[in-house]
Amino acid sequence: MTKEVIADMKAHMEKSVDALRREYQKVRTGRATTGLLDDIKVEYYGNPSPLSQVATLSVPEPRTITIQPWEAKLIPVIEKAIMNANLGFTPANDGKTIRISLPPLTEERRKEIVKTLKKMAEDTKVAVRNIRRDGIDSLKKLEKDKKISEDDLKRAEKEVQDVTNTFVAKVEEVLTHKEKEVLEV
């Protein structure tokens, strides 16, 4: 009984940490990544489509993203979508491809980004702790319904706390890695 509750908790906590990693991919560091353009939608035959579904995205240099649309007529549409996204960079095209050169981040902007990263990490830790609370509540209900003994409950609570500590440490690790990436000049 307790194993299922703990396994379910681990799965939910892992999803929280994965969600943080995905959010961090969208945060601009000094380096170019195609993840910066993940949220951009382009009008394609009347439907808003993700940029990655209408063009090939690549990072040929550390501060440059190239976008190669599958149809040349999409170039102005893609440029407009990038400009409307307010990401802080301007696309340039040569008729076949669109190049985005990322300007270097200022020290002030880097510190703002780190502050945002820390808030995102803290929100994830809160989510992990809420999952712990729900797990412990489930275990207490099992004990109340006499499906597990009081000793089993205490052992399971300790295991739940250990699992929670592990996932909080993972969040810290992800934050530290991204922080280093942002502060790297």
Swiss-Prot record:
Q: Which Gene3D superfamilies match?
A: 3.30.1360.40, Ribosome-recycling factor
Q: Which GO terms describe its molecular function?
A: ribosomal large subunit binding
Homology family: Belongs to the RRF family.
Cellular component GO terms, alphabetical: cytosol
UniProt-annotated location(s): Cytoplasm
Q: Which UniProt keywords apply?
A: Cytoplasm, Protein biosynthesis
Q: Name one GO biological process term.
A: cytoplasmic translational termination
Task: Identify the species of origin.
Answer: Geobacter metallireducens (strain ATCC 53774 / DSM 7210 / GS-15)
Position of the signal peptide: none
Q: Which Pfam families match?
A: RRF
The record, for CDD domains, names: RRF
Q: What does this protein do?
A: Responsible for the release of ribosomes from messenger RNA at the termination of protein biosynthesis. May increase the efficiency of translation by recycling ribosomes from one round of translation to another.
Q: What is this protein called?
A: Ribosome-recycling factor
